[in-house]
């Protein structure tokens, strides 16, 4: 059953890329939902991802672990967008900011240019 604490919305682009917009809490109870959503995107051929944290109120170690799982699963690029100071601090302190770093790119603009 989907959590009431995390909403995941996906924008798919014809370039094999997608933006995943999160709202709520990314924690022990909800992190598997993000991993599953990204796995489904990969199965559908979306390998380049932006994960938009603009609506995330809380991210705990399980949320960080989900990002590592996504990274290790072979997604070509993961860009983390709109990180609040707490999440940015966690990523910096754990070394994940460097591990997950990807060059900035505007997937929506790129999709418009292709289409």
Language-model features: locations:
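STAS-like cytosolic regulatory interaction modules
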Residues: 1-58, 62, 66-115
């Amino acid at each position: 059953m989907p959590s009431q604490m995390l909403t995941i919305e996906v924008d798919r682009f014809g370039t094999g890329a997608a933006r995943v917009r999160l709202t709520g809490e990314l924690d022990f109870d909800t992190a598997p939902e993000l991993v599953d959503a990204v796995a489904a995107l990969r199965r559908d051929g979306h390998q380049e991802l932006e994960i938009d944290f603009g609506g995330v109120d809380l991210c705990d170690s399980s949320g960080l672990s989900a990002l590592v799982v996504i990274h290790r699963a072979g997604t070509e690029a993961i860009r983390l967008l709109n990180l609040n100071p707490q999440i940015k601090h966690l990523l910096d302190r754990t070394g994940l900011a460097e591990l997950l770093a990807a060059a900035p790119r505007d997937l929506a603009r790129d999709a418009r240019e292709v289409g």
